Amino acid sequence: SLDTPVCDMEVRRFNKEAAALSDKVQILALSCDLPFAQARWCGAAGVQAVESLSDYKDVDFGKNYGVLIQELRLLARAIFVVAPDGTLAYSQLVPEVTNEPDYDAVLEAVKKLA
């Protein structure tokens, strides 16, 4: 959930990092929050460079990418970098949802594609 401390920090960090990335890079934040809650959080946090998407209804993204925590109906903390041709260029599954991702590794993977 975007309202949890680690998700909050992560999305704010990527929102900040977006300024240094190519305008061809699109950053998406997926959660099982309702779209209304996502919009509220993004507005309150001043997040404009990260688009939030909701997997609340069917959790299809979580199922298809193997990041659904079934018992909690939440998504595991994971980062996917998708190349312009649609192939998966990089992935990072954070073993503990209370930990932040390795931002440097993610940004390096993104910059290699730009």
PLM regions with names:
Residues 1-114:
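Chalcogenol-based redox active-site neighborhoods
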